[in-house]
Amino acid sequence: LNFKPEADAQWQELADIYTEKTGVKVNVVTAAANQYETTLKSEMGKSEAPTLFQVNGPVGLASWKDYCYDLKDSEIAKQITSDDFLLKDGDAVDGIGYAIESYGIIYNKNLLKKAGYTQDDIKNFDDLKKVAEDITKRSKDLGFSAFTSAGMDGSSDWRFKTHLANLPIYYEYQQDNIENTDAIKGTYLDNYRNIWDLYVNNSTTSPKQLSTKTGDDAVAEFVTEKAVFYQNGTWAYSDIADIGDENLGMLPIYIGVDGEEDQGLCTGTENYWCVNKKASKEDIQAT
């Protein structure tokens, strides 16, 4: 069961090649965007449930660990160079990371240059704020805005209520050695608010229209060079590749914390492959 609709064609092609070489029939089912968990529950209830499925980390594992085959002795687990890429429950290896992704503020180098800046001018939140607000002041003359629309419909809001929210949570975890969410005090909520306000007040769209803006709108604004900055990750490359590799860059998401000049991109294992231990031995072995 495939999590990523944008990779469906590649998975179908791979399944055909595998079947041709091994004689083992592979059926790939791809969940619709934002419907993976619902689809997984439905598929797992069928007589021929998926042998290979995905979870998004410890949260997903909590729901599906009773279905996870221990991959500790598998060939693929032996090839992993770091336990950071494994999803473990005690000594058991329940999942193998397959999507190592980074996210930040993608930017158009050419537009940034037209505005009179380069990446070297943006090392922290204050720098980003200065550049964004200056672009906004001159947007009519420049012909573009600072940020793409920060749409709050289901196709876009995860960029902000999940990815952007990770930043203040991360810094609080680091500062207070927090190990569970119950201990969160909201130390960096003002920083979260500040970066969000910067997005919505310096974008292609009035803040009053954000509820109607979609992820596709943000992509279109960036690709048609209506905005310099676009918060997203490496998975969005195929959507924006027409701009040209030489014209694309990515900045860390700065929120105004001490030492953020040394901050890098947000990087992690976004999804893990799991094998359904309730499948037949033949299917498990083939997988």
Named regions from a protein language model:
Residues F3-G60, K78-T81:
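Early extracytoplasmic/lumenal segment of secretory-pathway proteins
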Residues D94-Y98, Y103, K129-T181, A227:
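Extracytoplasmic/periplasmic solute-binding protein
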Residues A132-E133, I178-T212:
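Glycine-centered hinge/linker elements that transmit conformational signals in sensory
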Residues N56-N110, R159, A165, G249-L251:
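Hinge/lid segment of periplasmic solute-binding proteins
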Residues V24, M44-V55, L142, T224-N232, ...:
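Alpha-to-beta junction loops
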